[in-house]
């Protein structure tokens, strides 16, 4: 079931959240689906609900990372599905009034997954990053946060 507002208030009174980071979508993506409007609407509802439950907490929606598949004997970004889903997530974040972080671009954009696999930072399914890749992305994420905080004078 959904998180009730009452339960969220109880939880927040015990351990208040400074930030909530959401990351969804990798397994939703398929090469055949290029329209993620219903996904974006549902994600907007989820984020708005969290905003209601935790009104003083910053919320960041991490976009989907790169995902590759084999085409003509070589692994390549699952075009244009990755970009379509990432844009749907960006729209959902904008609509819900939260920050969007572009994981796909942070991974290097088109064919970024190839670099992750080559460096042992993603599984050979060319879909899922591993702990080493997560550490690399986390470093980029923190750099982005620090940059924005400095830019905003926080």
Where are these regions (language model features)?
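Structural recognition of the beta-strand scaffold that forms the well-ordered cores
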Residues: 18-23, 58-63, 99-103, 128
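Catalytic His-Asp segment of secreted/periplasmic serine-dependent ester chemistry enzymes
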Residues: 66-154
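Histidine (H) residue identity feature
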Residues: 35, 49, 56, 110, ...
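Conserved SGNH/GDSL esterase-like catalytic core that processes O-acyl groups on lipids
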Residues: 1-42, 52, 70, 128
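Extended interaction regions within the primary functional domain
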Residues: 7, 14, 30, 60, ...
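Active-site segments of SGNH/GDSL-like serine hydrolases
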Residues: 23-27, 49-84
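Short, functional N-terminal and low-complexity linear motifs
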Residues: 10-17, 55-56, 102-109
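Generic structural signal for well-ordered alpha-helices
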Residues: 43-48, 86, 90
């Amino acid at each position: 079931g959904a998180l009730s507002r009452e339960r969220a208030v109880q939880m927040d009174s015990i351990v208040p959240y400074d930030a909530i980071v959401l990351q969804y979508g990798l397994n939703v993506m398929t090469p055949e689906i290029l329209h993620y409007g219903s996904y974006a609407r549902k994600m907007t509802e989820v984020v708005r609900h969290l905003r209601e439950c935790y009104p003083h907490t910053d919320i960041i929606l991490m976009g989907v990372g790169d995902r590759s598949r084999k085409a003509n004997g070589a692994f390549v970004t699952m075009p244009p599905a990755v970009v379509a889903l990432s844009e749907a997530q960006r729209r959902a974040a904008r609509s819900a009034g939260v920050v969007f972080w572009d994981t796909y671009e942070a991974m290097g954009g088109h064919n970024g997954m190839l670099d992750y696999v080559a460096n042992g930072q993603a599984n050979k399914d060319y879909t899922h990053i591993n702990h080493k890749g997560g550490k690399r992305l986390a470093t980029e994420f923190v750099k982005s946060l620090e940059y924005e905080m400095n830019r905003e004078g926080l």
